[in-house]
Design a protein with these regions (language model features):
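Catalytic or ion-translocation cores adjacent to nucleophile or general acid/base/metal-coordination motifs
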Residues: 1-11
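Phosphate-binding and adjacent anionic-ligand microenvironments
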Residues: 11-218, 225-229, 235-241, 246-273
Length: 273
């Protein structure tokens, strides 16, 4: 999604055909590099949706109905690209769900452009990391089957909700957000389905040298497990940084992401017992 978002924005910029109020749409658990890319191009971004393309489609519907979604303004034609972490892409407002056909066409155009420039798609992705910072994303599955598993999962989420950790893997928890908090940004529940979807916890952590991380935890909507989405990111590469130093920073971020996921799962499972 980072590749296609940047590619489409760069092409529209080069062609002088950017819409009047361009907007990128994504979820809370999708890579944060999208936010940096959108801000680089000066476009609006919705980056805090729940998981599921019905939420992306709702943004388009709100723009269509009222011309606004929260602080974002525009029309459906202003959509640049909507995405989620499972590689779903929506790039046309008329198709309000995952659209693999358009995603393949965009990727093919990107690959052709890279080939003409003597580069590969991997080169393009590495360039994004250098320009916007390296992001390491991972997923931890906490499988809990049967009635007992469902009860354990509820205990785990309620335990973390009541007693959020102060630090994870040596990184201080800078903020904690419970999307079931009706005094928070999502407001009162709209119904039972909304309440279930908002069983979602967000832990943001701060590391050294501009490195930051995030863990999001939610029950799966289709399988007997909880999902912990882990992200650790660093700053853009300074022009004076050597290749060795850059490689070392990437390895450091990879290691921090692995440790963050491992320790978070251990602390979460302690509440499930």
């Amino acid at each position: 999604c980072a590749l296609l978002t940047h590619f489409k924005l760069s092409q529209l910029t080069q062609q002088g055909s950017m819409p009047a109020n361009p907007v990128v749409v994504t979820t809370e658990v999708t890579t944060g590099i999208l936010t940096r890319i959108a801000r680089h191009f000066g476009v609006q971004i919705v980056n805090n949706l729940l998981v599921g393309f019905k939420y992306h489609a709702d943004v388009i519907w709100q723009l269509e109905s009222t011309g606004r979604y929260e602080d974002v303004t525009g029309t459906p034609d202003d959509l640049i690209l909507a995405s989620e972490e499972s590689h779903g892409i929506m790039a046309m407002p008329g198709v309000r769900d995952k659209d693999s056909a358009v995603a393949v066409l965009l990727l093919a155009e990107l690959a052709l452009t890279c080939k003409r420039q003597g580069r590969t798609v991997v080169d393009y992705l590495n360039d994004l990391s250098r320009q916007f910072g390296y992001f390491k994303n991972g997923l931890e599955n906490l499988v809990m089957t049967g009635i007992e598993g469902k009860q354990n999962m509820a205990r785990m989420l309620d335990g973390l909700r009541a007693n959020p950790p102060k630090a994870i893997a040596g990184m201080a928890v800078a903020s904690f957000e419970d999307l079931r908090d009706e005094s928070g940004r999502m407001g009162p529940f709209k119904g039972d389905t909304d309440k279930a979807a908002r069983n979602f916890l967000i832990f943001r952590v701060a590391g050294p040298n501009g490195i930051a991380g995030k863990v999001c935890l939610r029950p799966s909507g289709t399988e007997p497990k909880a999902k912990a989405y882990v992200e650790v990111s660093g700053p853009p590469r300074p022009v004076t940084m050597t290749d060795d130093a850059w490689s070392k920073q990437i390895a450091e971020i990879d290691g921090m992401a692995a440790a963050l996921g491992k320790e978070f799962v251990a602390s979460a499972m302690a509440f499930a017992k």
